[in-house]
Amino acid sequence: MVDDRQGQRGGRRPRPSGGWSGPGRARPAQPQQPDGRHTPEPGPPIPPGVDARQLAPEIRGELSTLDRATADAVARHLVAAGELLDEDPEAALSHARAARARSSRIAAIREAVGIAAYYCGDWAQALAELRAARRMGSKSNLLALIADCERGLGRPERAIELARGPEAARLEGDDADELRIVAAGARADLGQLEQALTVLSTPQLDPARTGSTAARLFYAYADTLLALGRNDEALQWFLHSAAADVEGVTDAEDRVSELG
């Protein structure tokens, strides 16, 4: 079955088999200061070389409501989370949670937890955190991630509904293409491969494009063609995906070798 979620073949990761840390998991009592205020856990150690000043200026601006020591700790955990996201998403999630423990009312922090949870395949936590970030005014486009979380939770119909909504209609460029990939995957989840192919090819694909989003879009199109038994066309689009994949986010070259 075609699957665009973070999977091994398309450059995104598979869903973990268990051990999710969703909102229903019991939490230990939190330490408090003598005056009753919550004292956050120290969190994981900050990797060497991480500096709060590495945080994007717009996110540093969101931390301006915090005292200096707290803002510095949060910033360093967020930088660490970003640096670890691809190589060790579980560690990235630990750092993002450490930032959230110090301030849970800042959109960028909740977004960081949501994205790290998404990379870990913890769809329930990712969905809750990404929705919270949106409520708090996140300026990032999170619709494709939210729709993909719905897929991960076994609700492809909900992902399709989001992809048809007014917010989706306003998307352009890579943001629109990311949502196309998710919507096509949701169609494939339902066994609707022809509809998935239509989603991916509307508007018409441009094989001359490059970049990670184009590479994944072409890859998803090729994978859908392959699932439909159209192997020659699939090979051609895996070739386009490999050519577009300047950052190495897919295994398109391996698929070409398999089909060639």
Task: Tell me what each language-model feature is.
Residues 65-101, 112, 118:
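Alpha-helical segment of the N-proximal tetratricopeptide repeat
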Residues 80, 112-113, 146, 183, ...:
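Structural register within alpha-helical repeat arrays
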Residues 86-87, 120, 153, 190, ...:
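Structural motif corresponding to the intra-repeat A-B loop/turn of tetratricopeptide repeats
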Residues 136-139, 168-169, 198-205, 231-250, ...:
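TPR/TPR-like (Sel1-like) alpha-helical repeat modules
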